[in-house]
């Protein structure tokens, strides 16, 4: 998306991708990459599109994903703002205490935003709203996996507009 790419380059955003699922299922799939030019953005987007799904038919352990993401900032570039973008299509059925990790993120100055992928109802959206996002965060909802592209674009534009406001 040209609008998103331009803003990412202007702010020199650094991105990384962590795939997650169950208690022992978190993987840094793409390490930190700083968006210094439109070609960096395009290369990163292409790499994301080529990523195979790391975990299939596993539990849902968001606390462990949050732990992995918080620790991953130690390996990234220095930045004025740190944001975890967490997406998922279910509520927890394994793992630790999500609220504790949310409080840890807030104490560390990390914002957590969510992208809830719904099937029927709003269980994931409600879970993300009540337990995952930080006080300065928000949840965007995708109505199924086919709606993900629209929802992620809207979510990224909202995050970036917070910076450029």
Role assignments for model-derived ranges:
Residues 1-30, 35-87, 113-124, 147, 151:
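Von Willebrand factor
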Residues 2-9, 71-80, 104, 162:
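Surface-exposed acidic, glycine-flexible loop patches that form ligand/cofactor-binding
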Residues 11-48, 124-130:
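Short beta-strand-loop
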Residues 90-131:
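VWA/integrin I-like adhesion module and closely mimicked acidic/polar interface patches used
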Residues 117-164:
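Von Willebrand factor A/integrin I-like adhesion domains
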């Amino acid at each position: 998306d040209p609008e998103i790419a331009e803003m990412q380059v202007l702010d020199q955003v650094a991105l990384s991708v962590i795939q997650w699922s169950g208690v022992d299922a978190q993987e840094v799939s793409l390490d930190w990459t700083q968006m210094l030019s439109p070609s960096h953005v395009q290369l990163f987007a292409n790499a994301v599109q080529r990523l195979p799904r790391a975990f299939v038919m596993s539990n849902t352990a968001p606390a462990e994903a949050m732990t992995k993401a918080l620790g991953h900032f130690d390996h990234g570039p220095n930045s004025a703002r740190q944001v975890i973008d967490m997406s998922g299509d279910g509520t927890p059925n394994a793992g630790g205490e999500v609220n504790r990790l949310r409080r840890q993120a807030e104490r560390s100055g990390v914002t957590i935003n969510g992208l809830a992928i719904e099937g029927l109802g709003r269980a994931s959206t409600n879970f993300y709203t009540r337990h995952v996002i930080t006080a300065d965060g928000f949840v965007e909802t995708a109505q199924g996996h086919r709606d993900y592209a629209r929802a992620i674009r809207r979510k990224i534009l909202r995050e970036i507009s917070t910076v450029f406001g």
